[in-house]
Each structure stands twice: as structure tokens, then as C-alpha cells.
Amino acid sequence: MGKAWTDAPRVYLTGRITLERDRTAVDERRLPGRQGRRAFAYLVMERARPVPIDEVALAVWGTAEPSGAWETALSAIVSKLRATLKPLGFDARAIAAESGCYRLTLPAGAWVDVEAARRALDEAEGHVRARRPSQAWGPANVAASIAERPFLAGDDGEWIARVRAGLRDTRVRALECLAAVASANGEHPLAARLARDVVDLEPFRETGWQRLMRALADGGNRAEALRAYAECRALMAKELGVAPSPETEGIASTLRGARAGSSA
């Protein structure tokens, strides 16, 4: 009789790939090498559908036409993955072969970090829009923390780049949520630091510059806020040949008026 598992598995695809269930953990050192790591990550990400074997091969080897007997090699990788998952209560059906496809199935309630980050971001942004900052910090912090970790470090490929781009977007938006919460709580230096993180990651994202300018001004640093505006304007002109948006210009105009009023 098999072990009775009390918890659904947790799958970490960022950082070091790790699977946890109850008190049992399997990390990527148990996966069948670099190719096994790529195959597992791809099958987890695409588990909502059967994935054609040639698509899995492309994800594993990064080429549409792997050399040699690639179908045999891929079958061996999948067999080793099944063996790796067995200590966590997965049977051979966890990665099923059907009609020229592979499909990975996780038990009900399984938690996958990349997906959890997206859900947490949606929750945080909803709280920010509804002006519930106290409820936004937790999920925004979860999203930012997960999205900051590397995905398949040392590997590359179109699908890997897409996942990384999604994580980067999640992190940037989560940092914006955290900055909004900090501003709402009157923690203006923290809000400015978080907004600076946003513009460092995405320098053409004007909402980040706007948050930075407002946070600096609200913290009593109007000159620094105008300096941030000048930095934004110079970047836009040099790299894109455009001026900042009317909203950004409006914030700068308000800051100039406030500075003029204070010196009158």
C-alpha cells in the first residue's frame, strides 16, 4: 500500500528547481542533467495540454531538428523524470505518453511558483486599485520575491526567454504595487527606493518615473524629484526621440510651481 500524502506538491521552477511534498524534497540535482531540467520545466509550464514530442524536443535541445536518435533520447529523459518523481508519490502516469505527445499531470492543489507569482500579482494589483494598501503588500511581496529569482540559469532558448520576460514583467509590476503601498503608508523613502528599482529594470516605463517623482516630492525632496524628471526626459529624447507623456510633464510642472511658490 502506498504512502498516504497529506499535502499537495510544491514545485519551484525559479532558482534551483525543487519539488516538495510533505517532508520529502527532490531538487534539480536528481533530474537527468540539463536536458532533464529543461524537459521538466517545459512540461510543468505546458501541463494544461498534451505537448507534441517534437515540441518537447525543441524545448529540450533548442533546435527543430535534434541530431541523432532524438526520440529515443527524449524517451530516456522522460523515463528518468518519472523515476525522479516516484519518491514524491507520482506514478508512471504522471508523465503520460499519448498519441505522439507527452503530458505531465500534477495532483490537485499542486502549487507552482511561477503561477503563484502571477496570481499574487493579480491579487495585489486588485487591492491597489481598490485602495486597500494594507492587503496589497503581502501578495505583492510574494510576487516580487518569486519573480526576482532566475529561471533556468545558464540556459537559453525562445521559450526560456518568454518565461523570463514574464517574470520580469511580474517583478516590475509587483514593485510598483509595493511602491504604491509604501506611499499610501507615508513611507516615502521606501516608495522612492522601490520606484527607482522599477526604472532601473524598465527605464522606459514612465509609470515608474512618475512614482519616483511623486515619492521624492512627498518625502520633501522636490529638487530630487525634478532631477528624476530631467533624467527621464533626457533618456526619452536620446533613446526614443520623444518627450515624456503629458502626465509626466504635468507632475514636473506641479513640482516647479511648488518650488517657485516656496521661494516666493
Segments (PLM) and residue ranges:
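Active-site phosphate/pyrophosphate-handling residues
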Residues: 38, 55, 173
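Short coil-to-helix segment of the ABC ATPase nucleotide-binding domain corresponding to the Q-loop/switch region
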Residues: 48-60
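Intrinsically disordered, charged and Pro/Gly-enriched terminal/linker segments
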Residues: 26-30, 34, 42-48, 65-72, ...
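Glycine-centered, phosphate/nucleic-acid-interacting loop/turn motifs that mediate DNA/RNA or nucleotide
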Residues: 85
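Conserved RecA-like P-loop NTPase ATPase core
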Residues: 19, 40, 56, 81, ...
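Non-catalytic DNA-binding core/recognition domains of DNA-processing enzymes
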Residues: 74-82
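Short boundary/linker motifs that mark transitions into or out of structured domains
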Residues: 1-37, 92-103
